[in-house]
Amino acid sequence: HALRQNPQASAVLVTSPNYYGILQDIPRLAEICHAHGVPLLVDAAHGAHCKAVGLPSPIEQGADLAAVSTHKTLPAWGQSAILLSSGRIPFETLLETAPLFGTSSPSYLLLASIDLARAWLEGDGAQAYAQCAARVQALRREIAQTTVFDVLTEEKAPLDPCRLTIRCTDTNVTGQELSAILHEDFAIDAEMAD
């Protein structure tokens, strides 16, 4: 619909997974974008770990480019990220545009941290994320069964299995208040509350 209303669009940018852990239907979006002759770009900043839990990368699902922040869900240093490419956008084009958002003096410390994070993910990290996904699944069930809070589940939307999102809708507690309770009473720090 948006591409029909904006035929001048030169690309489509989506976020998947988003901050709440919701995944977009990348194969369907890629199909639509490519039918209109525009590339699909994915902000996968919070999805560097997804391969470890059995989720295909945006590129494997048909996206043209995907930006992945290795420092957000992998043990890489802050500001480290990688750009995944399907090859449909010529490498020369990427090189020409790199100075717009990159540097001519890359940090070898950041590059090394990306490589160490990759090695960890291929080794112990896969097991760590499998355990995390199992714990999140158990927490989703327990919260849904024993509290007044709603949790995002796979039945409601396709999700990152390692992201726990608790909703305060239809309760007398706000997200910020729940975050404070978790911190003060249980020593649990929420990454975000809104």
Where are the model-predicted features located?
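Conserved C-terminal alpha-helix-loop-beta "cap" of PLP-dependent enzymes
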Residues: 138-194
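Conserved PLP-enzyme active-site core in the AAT-like
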Residues: 1-153, 172
